Amino acid sequence: INGAIDAVSHIQPYALQCLQERSGSSVLTDGLDLYGKGYSDCVLAARTPLLEEKPEAVKAVIKAMMTAQLMTEQDTLSTLEETVGKYYKTSLESLKLAQSSQPVMIDQRNNTKFFYDRSVSMQKMGYVKNTLPSKAVNWTLLEEVIAENADLYGKLELKTAA
């Protein structure tokens, strides 16, 4: 980071990496003051035909994400070591800090209103023409995965809809 920019908005862990690597930089917001604890900045999106034709494949991805969350909660350091350099192009130290500020939480059902509210904000800022359609957020497959894997779900520490 050579100082050629005045401001940056970025996801974790890269936001923290910018902060660490540029002397004199400061955080204006980390999202918590805007959105509150437990907000999501990432979602799993799938086209309707995929959901209709291959729901088991989507459910397998959801279960894998829940399994990864559990692995992260049970042994954070090992999980981060597995992903640093391969998935996240940053230092282990930056990744640890990012994980502590925005931990993995797959069950985002209590954030439904948050998603719709953000689409209204995006429309007001001119980024999108239409707000999120009411049927765009569908928790059916997540709820099926939870029901089919109650033991796994029960072990998760972070859940927005317990």
Locate each region found by the language model:
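Intrinsic-disorder/low-complexity, polar/charged segments
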Residues: V8-S9, Q108, N138
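Short loop/turn and capping residues at structural boundaries
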Residues: I11, T29, K96, P133-S134
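Short secondary-structure boundary/hinge segments and terminal tails
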Residues: Q17-C18, G36-G38, S101-P103, N138-E144
